[in-house]
């Protein structure tokens, strides 16, 4: 597959042809291009779904340790803490700023190969963040507060690594600079994948979780089960496919019909891999030198 590269000339959109759009739409598109964009991979619902899937695959030992570490949380479950890392900017701005680059990785264009020196300087990317936090969680010598924080980071970051645009390209800031129109409003491709692709299924969280649990586990879920770099590289491969970058600014229902099955599969895989990671990190002796 080849990457469909978009340019401004690709779009007969509101920003380029004012005669074809209303002024409010033009201003909405312009505003969305200028404002900073939060990187909430999958959105709150998607992260809760990944966590819910993982919870169903925990070993009794891992489940007990998760419950112990999360004791005192408002919702002491994996789903309940699955968006904690995104909420840091509100309840702990310093940690939120320090961890901002841990949610994604910008990979090499056209081949999606991860090269640590080029793509993760100082270890500030989702791949190395997962490796670090897994080590902290597994280390029983660490204080419970440190291990609980590592658990909350992991629940979120594993989901992030499976959202294709969190393993995309620096050139377009993971789709943030790709301006699109959805239901007459301006947004961007990253935001579309953060929430609207999942929302297009029109299912509440409980129903969506059952839907994903009934899905056969994709074969690729067992590949690189403990290799976050492989997860990100596989996520990036979707960005390379024809049609991932829409041919026109206006998003039609056909886009969701084509790509929602991919999103569902990625959520299913993320839940399975998160469970495998937690089961391994929380087994007896996992953190011993």
For the regions a protein language model found, what residue spans apply to each?
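N-terminal secretory signal peptides that target proteins for export/translocation
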Residues: 1-19
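Structural motif marking the loop-to-transmembrane transition
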Residues: 19-22, 147
């Amino acid at each position: 597959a080849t990457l469909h590269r978009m340019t401004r000339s690709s779009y007969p959109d509101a920003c380029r042809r004012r005669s074809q759009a209303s002024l409010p739409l033009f201003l909405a598109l312009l505003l969305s291009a200028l404002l900073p964009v939060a990187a909430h991979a999958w959105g709150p619902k998607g992260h809760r779904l990944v966590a819910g899937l993982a919870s169903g695959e925990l070993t009794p030992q891992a489940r007990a340790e998760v419950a112990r570490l999360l004791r005192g949380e408002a919702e002491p479950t994996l789903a309940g803490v699955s968006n904690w890392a995104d909420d840091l900017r509100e309840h702990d701005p310093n940690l939120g700023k320090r961890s901002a680059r841990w949610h994604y990785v910008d990979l090499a264009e056209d081949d999606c190969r991860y090269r640590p020196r080029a793509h993760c300087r100082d270890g500030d990317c989702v791949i190395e963040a997962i490796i670090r936090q897994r080590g902290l969680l597994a280390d029983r010598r660490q204080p419970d507060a440190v291990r609980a924080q590592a658990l909350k980071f992991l629940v979120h970051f594993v989901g992030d690594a499976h959202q294709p645009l969190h393993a995309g390209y620096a050139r377009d800031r993971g789709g943030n600079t790709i301006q699109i129109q959805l239901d007459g409003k301006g947004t961007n491709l990253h935001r579309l994948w953060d929430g609207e692709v999942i929302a297009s299924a029109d299912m509440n969280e409980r129903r969506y979780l059952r839907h994903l649990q009934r899905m056969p586990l994709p074969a690729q879920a067992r590949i690189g089960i403990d290799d976050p770099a492989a997860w990100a590289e596989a996520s990036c491969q979707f960005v390379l496919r024809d049609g991932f970058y829409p041919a026109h600014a206006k998003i039609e229902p056909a886009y969701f019909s084509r790509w929602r099955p991919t999103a569902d599969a990625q959520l299913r895989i993320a839940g399975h891999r998160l469970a495998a990671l937690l089961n391994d990190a929380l087994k007896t002796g996992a953190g011993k030198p």
